Amino acid sequence: MSMKTKAAFHLVLFGLACWALISYFEASEGIASFFGTKSGGMVFDLNLTPFILFVAASAVYLYLQKKSRPARKQLLLPDEFEEQDEREQMMTAKACRASYIAVYFSLPAAAVLLIFYPLFQSRIPFFPIIIVFIIMIIQHLSYVISFKKNEKNSGAL
């Protein structure tokens, strides 16, 4: 599987995981009261669509991953650390540095945004979940973009 395909899958999985967590967050109060009552008479609504889509997308990703990579390192390391030679190790090191710098600047920005969270908590109660996933997406995109840029500069085909 190419790096662009993996990155696209990762972004889709991040989005679906964020949607699933938001759905759970919206239903969490009903779930807590459901388990808190002895009769179990309370009913809660939980949107299962994001969970089903996340499981389906994960299954497709794992199938394609298993097909393209040997079983020796199935889930131990992220896909980004499958260097074949020193050139790829150097590209990975530069991309990790770029990713670190992106997170270094995005975390304080997220902290500033979270300062204002009480002002709109009633309208967007799941805002911290969105912030966490935005940081993950920024980190991943900065890694992939830097890796591709370094790949072009290194003379790779």
Swiss-Prot record:
Asked if the Swiss-Prot or TrEMBL record annotates the protein with the keyword Transferase, the reply is no
Taxonomy, superkingdom = Bacteria
Q: What is its subcellular localisation?
A: Cell membrane
Lipid positions (S-diacylglycerol cysteine): 18
Answer yes or no on keyword Ribosomal protein: no
Lipidated sites in chain (N-palmitoyl cysteine): 18
Give the signal peptide, or none.
Answer: 1-17
Q: How does it sit in the membrane?
A: Multi-pass membrane protein
Its predominant location is membrane
Task: Write out the entry's keywords from A to Z.
Answer: Cell membrane, Lipoprotein, Membrane, Palmitate, Signal, Transmembrane, Transmembrane helix
Q: Kindly list the residue ranges recorded as spanning the membrane.
A: 42-64, 98-120, 124-146
**According to its record, what are the GO cellular component terms?**
plasma membrane
List the protein's name: Uncharacterized lipoprotein YgaO
Task: Name the species this protein comes from.
Answer: Bacillus subtilis (strain 168)
Species lineage: Bacteria, Bacillati, Bacillota, Bacilli, Bacillales
